[in-house]
Structures are given as C-alpha cells and as structure tokens.
C-alpha cells in the first residue's frame, strides 16, 4: 500500500501460474489463467479497501494501528511480471462476465509497462489522472485497446475522457439542476472505439536512450509529454506573471 496525502494505492503483485496448455500458446487457456490472476488480485485489494472504508485504518502484523482516517480516495492496482496481452486492458469484459465488480475495477498493468509509465510521468497529478480515467467503468467500455501504453499515451493527447450520464449526475448532485439537452446529447452520441497505436514517439524516445548494441545515437528524441489544457496553461502563466511582479 502507498499513501500520498489523501490518496491510497493498494497494490497486489501476482505471479501468473500457467497451465501446460497455456504454455503451448493456446489462447483460451492462457486468457483464463490471466483473468484468474487479475480477479484474485482485485478481490484481495477489494477486501483491504472495504476495511479502510469501514474502519478508517488497518491493523498491521505487529499489532499496531495504521490510521487512515484522512484517506478519501482508494485505488486498486494489480501488477505482474508477466505481460497480460488482451486481458489487462479488457476490464469491461471481465465486469460483463461477472469476474470483476463494477464498483472496484483495478488498474491492471505489467511491471514493465508500469516502469515505463513512471518514467513518462512528469507530475504526480498526471499519474493520478490516468489511474482515475483508466478505472472509470464507462472508460473501460468506450476505449478498447490491446496495449496499455496506447491508453496511457491517449491520455497525454486527448485525456481518455468519458461524458458522465447526466441523469445519474443530476441524482447524485441535485444542486446541478435538471440535465441539459446538450449534456444528454453528448452522452448519447458517445460510441465505443478501438484505440490504435500511439507509441511511435515513445519508441523513438526509448530507443534513443537505449540503442541496440553496436549503434550510436546522436540526439535523444523528445520524450512524450501530456498536452496541457488551455485553462491550466492560462493559470500557470498568470501565476508566473504575478510572481515576476513581486
């Protein structure tokens, strides 16, 4: 578990035991092994999350009490040394099959991808934004991808944003008033899409840092970075202006 201010990340690292049929490359047995590891990790993280929510803390092995009363946001993360192609990014299918609860969708990622994402992130807020968007139930339905890094780089470019259901938002936040026609239209116009490759810039940057043996690279390619929103850019600029004015 990692706690930063009022956000907690519950991390379950799973070794994936592959059956003999999976080791031969059969797709269906392999997918079942991967799905089983993900659901088991999600169940373990879910139990800890429930305990934190109910008790506002955890009893550690040495008997001491870890106070987590200030934690307001909890995310489950299931990692593995093994690659999880086609399963790690298919949360919606696991939810639809009843293998994952829709209210506790973990972020499922291989340690290799997690290491690359850690290198790409410039600010903690970028990482938190990605985990929030990545585990949003409707986002797992609207954005279908094979590669985790394609989803991550899509956040850098477009935000991986899904319009919320205005009817649900109105019920949960009545002060917003009745749903506007434009909000309902935008919500209904959303359609699922396949996320294609977004890793060209990442590949160029990574291979310029780690060229194959015997090759030399003159310049390091630019690292992919999150495109700042106009509002954030404007706010940063105004703060810098005030700072320069004393």
What are these regions (language model features)?
Residues 12, 22-23, 87-92:
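Short conserved micro-motifs at the rims of enzyme active sites and ligand-binding pockets
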Residues 74, 81-246:
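Composition-driven low-complexity segments enriched in polar/acidic and proline residues
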Residues 1-2, 68:
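Short glycine-biased active-site loop of nucleotidyltransferases that positions the nucleotide triphosphate
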Residues 10, 76-78:
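Structural beta-sheet core signal
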Residues 4-6, 31-36, 137:
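Short low-complexity stretches enriched in small and charged residues
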Residues 15-66, 71, 76:
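Catalytic cores of nucleic-acid endonucleases
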Residues 3-10, 14-20:
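Active-site beta-strand-loop-beta-strand hairpin of nuclease catalytic cores
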């Amino acid at each position: 578990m990692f706690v930063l201010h009022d956000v907690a990340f519950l991390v379950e690292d799973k070794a994936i035991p592959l059956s003999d049929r999976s080791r031969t490359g059969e797709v269906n047995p392999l997918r079942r092994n991967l799905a089983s590891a993900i659901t088991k990790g999600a169940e373990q993280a879910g139990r800890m999350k429930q305990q934190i929510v109910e008790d506002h803390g955890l009893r550690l092995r040495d008997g001491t009490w870890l106070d987590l009363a200030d934690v307001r946001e909890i995310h489950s993360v299931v990692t593995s040394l093994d690659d999880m192609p086609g399963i790690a990014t298919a949360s919606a299918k696991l939810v639809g099959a009843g293998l994952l609860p829709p209210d506790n969708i973990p972020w499922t990622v291989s340690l290799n991808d997690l290491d690359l994402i850690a290198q790409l992130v410039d600010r903690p807020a970028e990482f938190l934004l990605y985990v929030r968007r990545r585990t949003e139930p409707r986002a797992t339905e609207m954005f279908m991808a094979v590669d985790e890094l394609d989803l991550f780089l899509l956040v850098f470019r477009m935000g991986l944003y899904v319009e919320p259901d205005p009817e649900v938002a109105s019920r949960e936040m009545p002060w917003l008033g009745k749903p506007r026609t434009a909000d309902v239209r935008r919500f209904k116009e959303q359609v699922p899409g396949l996320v294609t490759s977004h890793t060209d810039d990442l590949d160029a940057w990574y291979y310029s840092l780690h060229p194959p043996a015997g090759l030399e690279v003159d310049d390091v390619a630019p690292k992919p970075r999150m495109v700042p929103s106009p509002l954030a850019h404007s706010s940063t600029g105004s703060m810098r202006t005030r700072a320069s004015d004393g």
